[in-house]
Amino acid sequence: MASKEELLQELSDAIVSCKKDRVIAAVEKAKEVMEPAEIIEKGLAAGMNQVGTLFERGKLFLPHVMMAADSMTAGVNILEAEMPAGTETKKLGVIVNGTVEGDVHDIGKSIVSTMLQSAGFEVHDIGRDVPIKNFVEKAKEVNADMIGLSALMTTTMQGQRDVIELLKEEGMRERVKVMVGGAPATQAWADKIGADCYAENASEAVAKAKELLLGK
């Protein structure tokens, strides 16, 4: 019988391999000795973390990321189907995530959404080229704890500031945290516009979200 560490390693490796059948086999084996939350967080999400890192380094490409995310969803679905009726996995918080108006880049933001979801957050990904007011309207609708704002061009970064200003106008700024990211964004920019945090990559986005919303 494989040890827990070996099972978790295989779950992670299976995600990185982007092979759905391998992920499903690893989940089937792991669920005999582990709780679903542990399988997701320490196995599947760890693998997705690795995928995010490899993508950022140019070692994996978008099709790999999408296949890995699809494989992870298949694994999570198996675990959710086995939970007793009425059992709900506790969500760590509600996050609205999107790419600001004028910016059609989607890849990094999609990876962040996948990673946040796999870490246990309820994520509402509202896509790319999103008008400023839509972020705030969606945050109201779903009672969001945080808004994630991605901008991949210097010309669209201003949209991140505009969302924060609109949150203030709507009297929501105290309650809703704001995370910014994207190639031109920096910690200095986040400080300048009054964002709560800046995340350089998907793994950091998860860590910062936990830190801000859970104090972890």
UniProtKB/Swiss-Prot annotation:
One of its GO terms (molecular function) is methyltransferase activity. Belongs to the methylamine corrinoid protein family. The gene is mtbC2. InterPro entries: Cbl-bd_cap, Cobalamin-bd, Cobalamin-bd_sf, Corrinoid_p, Dimeth_corrin_MtbC, Met_Synthase/Corrinoid, Meth_synthase_dom. Keywords: Cobalt, Metal-binding, Methanogenesis, Repeat. Residues 1-91 form the B12-binding N-terminal domain. Residues 92-216 form the B12-binding domain. One of its GO terms (biological process) is methanogenesis. Acts as a methyl group carrier between MtbB and MtbA. Methylcob(III)alamin binds at H105. Pathway: One-carbon metabolism; methanogenesis from dimethylamine. This is Dimethylamine corrinoid protein 2. It comes from Methanosarcina acetivorans (strain ATCC 35395 / DSM 2834 / JCM 12185 / C2A). CDD domains: corrinoid_protein_B12-BD.
